[in-house]
A protein has these predicted regions:
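Active-site neighborhood of HAD-like aspartate-dependent phosphohydrolases
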Residues: 7-66, 166
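Short, acidic loop-to-helix structural element flanking the phosphoryl-transfer center
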Residues: 64-98, 105-110
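Short, structured coil segments at secondary-structure junctions
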Residues: 92, 121, 157-158
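Substrate-recognition "cap/lid" segment bordering the active-site pocket of phosphatases
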Residues: 99-142, 148-152
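Short amphipathic alpha-helix with an adjacent loop that forms part of the alpha/beta core around
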Residues: 134-138, 173-179
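Acidic, Mg2+-coordinating phosphoryl-transfer loop and its flanking beta/alpha structural elements
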Residues: 142-176
């Protein structure tokens, strides 16, 4: 005898999703890498720069440290986020594409590409500024990202946005979608 649940499962068509996943703050721990070099979290560093040199200098000095003084090795050496490998292992069977925001210097594109080569070789990566990620949104297209504004923009283009808070929460939301 077949259960009603079994019949219901068989009647539901399988939805083919396209998964896009952010890197920094989802898979790769940007903050830990920054703190390794600066001795302060990014927020603490920005506050210190603002106090010493004024708020107009914050972004220039922040990105100068990362892209000019450290360069490619900053990006290539970023450690996995806690739970990042677990999340990657969960989404990998669905052939995700990384959708990552680069800094304005080419060192981030080069370093992030090397990070992918070192940790998850063969994975496609697309570089887009956060505000332009929604160009890839649409029905059945999922974005996992840690920026609320990026997720809201994605959803406004009929995409499925999952705001990353932690690995378990993301996996739970993916399971709710049948993944």
């Amino acid at each position: 005898m077949i259960s009603i649940n079994k019949l219901f499962e068989e009647e539901q068509p399988k939805i083919n999703y396209t998964i896009y996943c952010d890197m920094d703050g989802v898979l790769a721990d940007f903050e830990a890498r920054f703190e390794h070099f600066a001795g302060l979290s990014p927020d603490e560093y920005r506050k210190e720069i603002a106090q010493k040199y004024g708020s107009k200098q914050v972004d220039n000095m922040f990105w100068d440290l990362i892209d000019k003084q450290i360069g490619v090795r900053f990006w290539r050496g970023i450690p996995w986020m806690p739970g990042g490998r677990q999340l990657w292992d969960y989404i990998k069977p669905y052939n995700p594409t990384l959708l990552s925001s680069p800094s304005f210097d080419n060192s981030s594109r080069m370093g992030k590409s090397l990070w992918v080569k070192d940790h998850i070789p063969g994975t496609p990566i697309i570089f887009r500024q956060a505000k332009k990620k929604s160009e890839f949104a649409g029905p059945n297209k999922i974005l996992i990202d840690d920026r609320e504004d990026t997720i809201m923009s994605w959803k406004s283009k009929n995409g499925i946005g999952i705001l990353y808070k932690n690995t378990d929460q993301v996996i739970s939301e993916l399971k709710q979608l049948g993944l």
